[in-house]
């Protein structure tokens, strides 16, 4: 069975996940080989995979040998609390870009958002902390950028983090400055939180692509 997750949405539009890892927990490092990492620039890891640390470490080793950068999303504060030691090892050894929301950053560092940003930045090249309706914070070395959220009526936050990361990494892999990467992340996230479900409808993508072009060209 493949990975499945049930999203339970509360009246405040927040979500709680009931997750079954399925085949992701059955795979081993032997299922990966260097050919699978050829011709890619970046490996994106979902934090739930830390339940299979052997697989994560093998993927990171192969990605590094292939010259790839590695991005990680912490996924869930309770997953971070349960696997704190493993996360610390993987992040400090392999991760270049780390995505977290405020709860996840607090679970990882034991600090509030500002101090968490500083602590995480000692381990990775780029730190991104998503701050809900306040937007997000992006830090690289001494550069700290505040990214505004795109104002929309929030219905369901499921998928917001994944879409933010997708937009951010699209900008990053196309050599955009971090401010524009964050703006693309906010744009995509805003297009999934104003409706139920974790996918942006196909009908919205033409307008989204136009807005991404506007961000790049401004």
Specify the residue positions occupied by each region the protein language model found.
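Conserved N-terminal subdomain of the carbohydrate kinase-like
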Residues: 1-42, 209-218
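Proline-centered loop/turn at the N-terminus of a beta-strand
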Residues: 5, 69, 97, 125-126
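Short, acidic/turn-prone active-site loops that include or flank metal/cofactor-
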Residues: 21-24, 75-77, 150-153
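Short, charged, surface-exposed secondary-structure boundary motifs
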Residues: 27-28, 81-82, 108, 154-158
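Alpha-helix C-terminal capping/helix-to-coil transition sites in glycosyltransferase folds
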Residues: 38-39, 93-94, 123
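Conserved beta-alpha-beta core of the PfkB/ribokinase-like small-molecule kinase fold
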Residues: 42-118, 134-135
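Conserved phosphate-binding/catalytic region of the ribokinase-like
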Residues: 61, 85, 113-218
């Amino acid at each position: 069975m493949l990975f499945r997750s049930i999203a339970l949405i509360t009246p405040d539009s927040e979500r709680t996940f009931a997750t079954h890892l399925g085949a992701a927990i059955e795979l081993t490092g032997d299922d990966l080989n260097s050919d699978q990492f050829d011709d890619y620039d970046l490996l994106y890891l979902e934090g739930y995979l830390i339940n299979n640390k052997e697989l994560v470490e093998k993927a990171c080793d192969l990605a590094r040998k292939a010259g790839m950068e590695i991005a990680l999303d912490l996924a869930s504060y309770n997953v971070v609390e349960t696997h704190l030691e493993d996360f610390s090892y993987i992040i400090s050894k392999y991760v270049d870009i780390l995505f977290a929301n405020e709860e996840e950053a607090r679970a990882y560092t034991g600090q509030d958002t500002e101090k968490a940003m500083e602590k995480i930045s000692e381990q990775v090249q780029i730190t991104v902390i998503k701050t809900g309706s306040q937007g997000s914070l992006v830090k690289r070395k001494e550069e700290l950028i505040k990214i505004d959220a795109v104002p929309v009526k929030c219905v369901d936050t499921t998928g917001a983090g994944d879409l933010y990361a997708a937009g951010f990494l699209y900008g990053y892999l196309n050599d955009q400055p971090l401010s524009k990467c964050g703006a693309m992340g906010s744009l995509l996230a805003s297009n999934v939180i104003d409706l139920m479900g974790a996918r942006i409808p196909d009908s919205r993508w033409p307008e989204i692509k136009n807005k991404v072009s506007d961000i790049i060209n401004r």
